[in-house]
Regions:
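N-terminal secretory signal peptides that target proteins for export/translocation
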Residues: 1-4
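Bacterial N-terminal signal peptides
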Residues: 8-20
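Exported/periplasmic ABC-transporter solute-binding proteins
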Residues: 25-100, 104-272
Length: 272
């Protein structure tokens, strides 16, 4: 019931958000999608605007699926998704053109979190009561069933089985609908533990500590070296026939200045 209600409310909110946005206009680049990329888009948008004179407007609150729907509807010029496109989305003429990587992390409001092993993180999802070393409770924050981050949680930490499904049956666990809700809830709740995207947490200057996994601290350097494995891939997507602003934006991101801006936004190139 809670999962269905969360999904329904997300759908209603998305409809209201899309209805408030005009169709993409010339001279302005309309971008949006996963909340994990909102601050990143604002960051890379500044040098793009300085170089081209094209203003960048980041539409909040869409999520990956909502951003791709808005792109197909002509509301956005470029969307950033936290997952690969579905067959139906590709059939609507959407094309992934650039991928970037950033560490996929667990964050907490705890002042001095320990390094955790992968099994220890998985245990937080299965055990009813887990405590930090000082005895204070670990408060796990979940994401909605359809959220793209769930794939990373399962891939890198939980493995096979419906561990997330069983965790959702625990009424005491809070659910954060958006990436910004997730980070905000993690800041507010004492002893929180939440999955998140490294670039978002750093760029939004969140008052959170990142969990070292098997003794390895997440960073762009440890991701690049292969020492830190959990990875979040972000997909820049535009229509089969992109707007002039979208084409210039993608061209910028592929330039030396754009690659530098993406690196400053705590991401690495992906595989195109």
């Amino acid at each position: 019931m809670r999962a269905r209600l969360t999904s329904l409310l997300s759908g209603i909110a998305l409809g209201l958000v899309l209805s408030a946005f005009p169709v993409a206009a010339a001279g302005v680049l309309q971008v949006g999608g996963t909340g994990a990329a909102a601050a990143l888009l604002a960051h890379v948008g500044k040098p793009f605007t300085q170089q081209t004179g094209i203003a960048v407007e980041v539409k909040p609150g869409l999520g990956s699926s909502g951003g791709l729907s808005a792109l197909a509807a002509g509301v956005l010029d470029v969307a950033v998704a936290g997952r690969a496109l579905s067959g139906a989305e590709a059939a609507r003429g959407l094309v992934p053109v650039i991928t970037i990587r950033t560490p996929f992390v667990f964050v907490t409001s705890h002042h001095a979190p320990p390094s955790m092993t992968v099994p220890e993180i998985a245990n937080v999802y299965t055990a009813e009561k887990v405590a930090w070393p000082d005895g204070s409770p670990v408060v796990l924050i979940l994401r909605p069933r359809e959220d793209a981050d769930n794939h990373c949680i399962v891939q890198y930490f939980l493995g096979k089985g419906d561990v997330l499904g069983r965790a959702r049956q625990r009424a005491e666990l809070p659910v954060a609908v958006t990436d910004q809700d997730n980070a905000g809830m993690a800041e507010r709740l004492k002893g929180s533990l939440a999955a998140a995207t490294y670039a978002q947490i750093i760029l939004e200057q969140r008052d959170l500590r990142m969990i070292a996994v098997d003794g390895v601290v997440p960073s762009i350097e440890t991701l690049a070296s292969g020492a830190y494995l959990p990875t979040k891939v972000l997909y820049f997507v535009h229509p089969l026939q992109p707007s002039a602003a979208a084409s210039r934006f993608i061209q910028f991101l592929r330039s030396d200045e754009g690659v530098r801006a993406l690196r400053e936004a705590h991401t690495l190139p992906g595989v195109e």
